[in-house]
Amino acid sequence: DEVVALCLNTTQDVFLARVFRVQSMLQRRYPKQIRFGYAWAEGLFSGEKLVKEARAIMLCDQLEVAGSSPVPHEPVRRGTDVKTQEGLERFVVFFQPKVDMRSGKTVGAEALVRGVDRRGLIVPPSHFMEHMESSGAIRNLDLFVLDSTLAAMERWRRKGLQLLPISVNFSRFTLFSPSSPGAVLAILSRYPYISSTLLELEISESALDVETGSLIRAMDFFRPFGLSFSLDDFGCRYSNLSLFTSVAFDTIKLDRSLVKDIITNAMSLELVEDIIGLCSTRKMSCIAEGVENQAQVDALLNVGGMYAQGFYYARPIPMMEFEQNHLIRSITGKPEMRPADQKTEGD
């Protein structure tokens, strides 16, 4: 059973104090039996969105009730219900390059998770993502991708390769889980030689269906770590328009549905041009997703577009292939050495 309680005409401090008091009482009386979520809004609000936000936190709380850990490799070891259902053995991270259309050079990448079945075949996320979101296990998968990305960047650093910015997708379950900032900070601390400014949290569409104030507060927990944010699938829904004006994203990713029609639909091209102009005014990067041909590239360049991602340039590829084809040596051409790697006389 699920019970929803609504607290009206109170301040945020009083509300949170009540929440934590009730949560503590329930955990003492019914240890590991009660799942608990909450959400706060000020001024006008949508009850449906608040319940969705609270339920997302509750599903994350379910994992802790069940005794799981926020360790980033957890989905690989413990996601047995998902793996058994979909026939998966493990998860791997692929990278899809982001390209400067003016020069054709790779300027970054998006980290994307894939499953591997018992035959060693790659399984797309559409086969398992919905189940992981409904079970709340998506948070551990997001953290696994973040940790795997940082581990890859550390390997590249030690090889003397030039590091590029990488974006990692975060679902609403991960973004709104109270324990996520601590888990992210713990992961970042394991890679002290990788600048957090090279990482971008890409907010998936599912995270957008919440109160704007709640979204801003959730993002503010991660900003002190040096992380930036991108708004994914911009233009696919009307609700994104209000987010564009009220939330300080660092990057806007144009939805593929907008890019697909820019050759045949003059209005789509004008809309894309306006969005690119707004991004430039607000000092945001703008990336066109789903670019599939040279005609789209030419059209985007003509209206001020600079960056793109899509099959025309590259499909999502394994880490090693990305390293070999899209990374170059640093200026020195020599790997940097950590203090732990350096030897002194007598060692």
Where are the regions a protein language model picked out?
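GGDEF/GGEEF active-site signature
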Residues: 2-42, 185
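Short catalytic/binding micro-motifs of nucleotide second-messenger systems
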Residues: 18-33, 152-158, 188-190, 327-330
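Surface-exposed amphipathic alpha-helices with a cationic face
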Residues: 23, 153, 157, 216-224, ...
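Catalytic/regulatory signature loops of cyclic-dinucleotide turnover enzymes
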Residues: 27-35, 48-76, 81-92, 119, ...
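PAS and PAS-like sensory/regulatory domains
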Residues: 30-35, 91, 109, 164-166, ...
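Catalytic core of bacterial c-di-GMP phosphodiesterases, primarily the EAL and HD-GYP domains
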Residues: 40-44, 105-107, 137-215, 290
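EAL-family c-di-GMP phosphodiesterase catalytic domain
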Residues: 51-55, 59, 66-71, 101-105, ...
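A short, well-structured catalytic beta-strand-centered motif of the EAL phosphodiesterase domain
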Residues: 90-130, 149, 250
